[in-house]
């Protein structure tokens, strides 16, 4: 059973930092908005640099504070965004099931993780916009096969129709919580939201 926090400053048992990465336009910001506020915007949100939201959930009798960072997919922001990989405890790699190129680039994003994140970071592959079945070009079996190749979990989601969004974030949080219990000396490295790295959003076109 999960529920949004009524008081963001309330006590919590675990603080977990998650990171959303993937090409521009795959719907990372929409996934974050759906999970954190249970809302959806039909406008495409271009993240400038990096942005974050917080949601506290109840998970297996513990209060888990999720600090979720949304990164820009554009190459010109890569230096800024890769700086946040090191502190991530979990990373969601997002592609658009209607965009073959975004799926092909997942291997590049995984290489970025291998170069900049900790070895123990939990990962999950997300095929977003699964509600657009008539435009789908990346079959579910291909997503599952790629995830299996890297030994990570896979889900198809729709931020627009709220399909598997909750499940994706909660599943990753559960895996991280288990790892923290199994390795009690591991402390989360949390990037504090002190400096605004251009987190303002520009709205352009449709996103799911």
Swiss-Prot record:
The keyword Repressor does not apply. One of its GO terms (molecular function) is GTP binding. Residues 186-201 have a biased composition (Polar residues). Transmembrane segments: none annotated. GTP binds at residues 22-29, 70-74, 128-131. It comes from the Eukaryota. Residues 186-208 are annotated as: Disordered. A lipid is attached at residues 207-208 (S-geranylgeranyl cysteine). PANTHER family: LD44762P. Protein transport. Probably involved in vesicular traffic. Belongs to the small GTPase superfamily. Rab family. This is Ras-related protein Rab-8A. The gene is rab8A.
